[in-house]
Amino acid sequence: MAGPVKDREAFQRLSFLYQAAHCVLSQNPENQALARFYCHTEKTIAKRLVLRQDPSVKRTLCRSCSSLLIPGLTCTQRQRRRKGQRWTVQTCLTCQRSQRFLNDPKHLLWGDRPEAQLENQADINPSEPLPNIADLPKENIQTQALNTSE
């Protein structure tokens, strides 16, 4: 289980703004300006406090106009093939900016990989300990530097 989260109130505020933008668009799809304001405020708070947002949240926000991207309502979503790979192309209907996302079932985001978790990084031990440079004569230090650079 994860430990206590730093800036818990800030993450709760970001979550509230994101949910409020979804609520506004679901109740009244014409009120995109208010939803855009909520999303822009969310991005500003996250940037000011240097907080990392989940990639799934960032993918649902337009990078230029801060609109909430909901397929069929505020954006179009198409499947394309390019150079043998499948891509999902989202185009914002407000500013016409498009984003491409790799559509590969085998692809894992870095945050979802096991080696990205802090618990797993602490368990990894180097195969052999590094020598203490203060204990070695200068000739050995130079030869070790040459061996490691090769």
Curated annotation (Swiss-Prot):
The modification N-acetylalanine is found at A2. Its main location: nucleus. Gene3D superfamilies: 6.20.50.20. GO terms for cellular component: multimeric ribonuclease P complex; nucleolus. InterPro entries: Rpr2/Snm1/Rpp21. One of its GO terms (biological process) is tRNA 5'-leader removal. It comes from the Eukaryota. GO terms for molecular function: metal ion binding; ribonuclease P activity; ribonuclease P RNA binding. Zn(2+) binds at C62, C65, C92, C95. Pfam families: Rpr2. Keywords: Acetylation, Metal-binding, Nucleus, tRNA processing, Zinc. Residues 121-150 are annotated as: Disordered. Residues 140-150 have a biased composition (Polar residues). It is found in: Nucleus, Nucleolus. RNase P consists of a catalytic RNA moiety and about 10 protein subunits; POP1, POP4, POP5, POP7, RPP14, RPP21, RPP25, RPP30, RPP38 and RPP40. Within the RNase P complex, POP1, POP7 and RPP25 form the 'finger' subcomplex, POP5, RPP14, RPP40 and homodimeric RPP30 form the 'palm' subcomplex, and RPP21, POP4 and RPP38 form the 'wrist' subcomplex. All subunits of the RNase P complex interact with the catalytic RNA. Component of ribonuclease P, a ribonucleoprotein complex that generates mature tRNA molecules by cleaving their 5'-ends. Belongs to the eukaryotic/archaeal RNase P protein component 4 family. This is Ribonuclease P protein subunit p21. It comes from Mus musculus. The lineage of its organism: Eukaryota, Metazoa, Chordata, Craniata, Vertebrata.
